[in-house]
């Protein structure tokens, strides 16, 4: 009598579990609430110069891919270093950054940039998480301020300009 009871128990368990394991809705969408796209125009030149080279994030072989003058180009035949970064490339880099960790990005933006270290982008740039390029910013330096002020919705244009020439 134990066997039929066990079969009934397993069948009931599976019947309850199967709906929970249903495939995701293919029509579902996620709204990305990234930092202001227009102000990214001030941040992008620093990221392109420091992070977007072919040996770093300017390649298709990285999870975070950046497009622009120093690395990957969107237009066929446009080679690195040959022409300025296009607006389409800035858009693609913005989308790549915002979509890397969409839920965390949404939370950081909703919190007006509080605790930006929740983002892998910030942790790796600061060197608090393993990064092949090492630490590229120090907390509070102009490079860090450029990124974190953008995440907070108050892009520090002066810091972003200084980040381009910061040693």
Where does each model-flagged region fall?
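Sec-dependent bacterial lipoprotein signal peptides
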Residues: 1-21
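Aromatic- and Gly/Pro-enriched helix-to-coil junctions and flexible linker segments
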Residues: 21-167
């Amino acid at each position: 009598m134990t066997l039929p009871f066990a079969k009934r128990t397993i069948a009931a368990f599976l019947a309850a579990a199967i709906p929970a394991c249903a495939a995701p809705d293919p029509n579902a969408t996620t709204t990305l609430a990234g930092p202001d796209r227009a102000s990214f125009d001030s941040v992008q030149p620093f990221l392109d110069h420091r992070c977007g080279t072919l040996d770093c994030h300017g390649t298709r072989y990285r999870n975070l891919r950046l497009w622009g003058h120093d690395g990957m180009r969107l237009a066929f035949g446009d080679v690195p270093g040959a022409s300025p970064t296009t607006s389409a490339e800035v858009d693609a880099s913005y989308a790549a950054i915002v979509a890397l960790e969409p839920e965390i990005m949404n939370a950081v933006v909703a919190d007006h940039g509080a605790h930006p270290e929740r983002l892998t982008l910030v942790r790796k740039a600061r060197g608090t998480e393993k990064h092949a390029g090492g630490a590229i910013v120090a907390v509070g330096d102009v490079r860090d301020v450029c990124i974190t002020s953008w995440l907070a919705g108050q892009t520090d244009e002066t810091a972003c300009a200084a980040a381009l020439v910061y040693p």
